[in-house]
């Protein structure tokens, strides 16, 4: 839980400080990475970013649950557990105890940092977690253009690319996770390797899709901006959440106007 994780950070901080490091290797990069890495914190605390129909953000994006989550992140910097600026290879060099990253990081470390004693931990959940799904999902997607002249063939290709055999090949060639249970279960590594086994367990048991909304790009960018502005530049979290609602609403107008 959040409170348990905070206690762990307190204990490891003196150790990594001797190496001129931090307890956490944690950044808020632009693009899709930030919402992918940190949405689980919001979800496990009972928060979300848009309404179920994807057309409302006021009272959702700026909810009290989301404010609590942002303030929890702020406590990391306030207590010196993370750096205000990105430090290259902080975790990989042994100067950070924890790193938030995608499943692909396991393969990166196996190949490039074989001396790192890597362990995958479950996502940290809120003390208010109700046991629901909270782990981020999603990767490559395949689709046919609405203007394709070969719809039947394109449909078959998308079906194959989204299926078992394609998933197994994607894993073998690129280490991108499959999208079907059968593909996972046909690859022994997801049982034999403890880190990949832990990742599969998280995905299969707690996988949570990101928000479905016509203004998803604005939602994703706003999550990144709120965390960067609130945590790294110490702006008021509630003000930043409310500003994001205004920005997203400006884009939502075209979809909700009658």
For every predicted segment, state its role.
Residues 6-9, 91, 237-249:
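Short, well-structured alpha-helical segments that form the helix of a local strand-helix-strand
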Residues 114, 121-122, 172-229, 254-257:
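Long, aromatic- and glycine/proline-rich binding clefts that accommodate carbohydrate-like moieties
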Residues 14-30, 83, 163-174, 250-258:
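Bilobed periplasmic-binding protein-like "clamshell/Venus-flytrap" ligand-binding domains
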Residues 6-11, 53-84:
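Glycine-centered hinge/linker elements that transmit conformational signals in sensory
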Residues 97-102, 119-121:
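Paired acidic/hydrophobic, glycine-rich loop segments that form the ligand-binding mouth/hinge
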């Amino acid at each position: 839980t959040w409170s348990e994780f905070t206690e762990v950070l307190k204990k490891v901080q003196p150790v990594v400080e001797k190496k001129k490091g931090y307890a956490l290797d944690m950044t808020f990069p632009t693009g899709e990475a930030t919402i992918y890495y940190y949405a689980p914190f919001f979800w496990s605390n009972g928060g979300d970013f848009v309404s179920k129909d994807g057309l409302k953000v006021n009272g959702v994006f700026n909810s009290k649950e989301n404010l609590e989550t942002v303030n929890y992140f702020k406590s990391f910097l306030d207590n010196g557990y993370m750096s205000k600026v990105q430090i290259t290879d902080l975790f990989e060099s042994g100067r950070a105890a924890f790193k938030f990253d995608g499943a692909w990081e396991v393969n990166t470390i196996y190949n490039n940092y074989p001396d790192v004693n890597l362990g995958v931990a479950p996502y940290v959940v809120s003390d208010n977690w109700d046991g629901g799904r909270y782990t981020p999902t999603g990767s490559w997607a395949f689709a046919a253009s609405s203007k394709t002249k070969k719809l039947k063939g394109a449909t078959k290709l998308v079906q194959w690319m989204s299926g078992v055999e394609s998933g197994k090949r994607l894993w073998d060639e690129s280490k991108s996770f499959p999208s079907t249970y059968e593909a996972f279960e046909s690859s022994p590594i997801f049982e034999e390797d403890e880190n990949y086994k832990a990742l599969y367990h998280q995905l299969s048991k707690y996988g949570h899709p990101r928000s479905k909304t016509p203004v998803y790009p604005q939602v994703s960018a706003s999550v990144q901006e709120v965390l960067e502005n609130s945590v790294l530049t110490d702006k008021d979290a509630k003000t930043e959440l409310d500003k994001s609602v205004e920005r997203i609403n400006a884009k939502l107008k075209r979809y909700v106007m009658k």
